[in-house]
Amino acid sequence: MRYLIAILSLLSLANAQFGGFFDQMFGQQGGHEQHHGQPQNNPSDASHYRHQYDNSVCDKYLCPDTLACVHFPHHCPCAWDAQQEKFELAEGQRMCVSRGGFREGETARKLELARKGLL
């Protein structure tokens, strides 16, 4: 009887420890897929983006990368404004550049050097 209890305890411990691992690795149990209400991944094509773009309401300019509604294209915000700096270019466009841990103004200086062909 003690052996039976010990074996059952070990099996339940192993299931608790590795059960999720095996379910994730093999994705099936008993030949049937299990769905526990987990969210589905976005599709691998552009249909999700097109749906968001098509359903956006904007009477001015709709920024293609952030779907923000602004007056002019160069007013579009950067998608990751905490990590990127926005630079407005002379042609009425804008560019988002990673801050990269540089000193204040260093990114702008490097962008200007690149624009002049010196970098």
Curated annotation (Swiss-Prot):
The keyword Iron does not apply. The keyword Signal applies. Residues 29-48 are annotated as: Disordered. Keywords: Signal. One of its GO terms (biological process) is ERAD pathway. Residues 1-16 form the signal peptide. CDD domains: LCL2-like. Probable component of the endoplasmic reticulum-associated degradation (ERAD) pathway. Belongs to the LCL2 family. PANTHER family: LONG CHRONOLOGICAL LIFESPAN PROTEIN 2. This is Long chronological lifespan protein 2. It comes from Fusarium vanettenii (strain ATCC MYA-4622 / CBS 123669 / FGSC 9596 / NRRL 45880 / 77-13-4) (Fusarium solani subsp. pisi). The lineage of its organism: Eukaryota, Fungi, Dikarya, Ascomycota, Pezizomycotina.
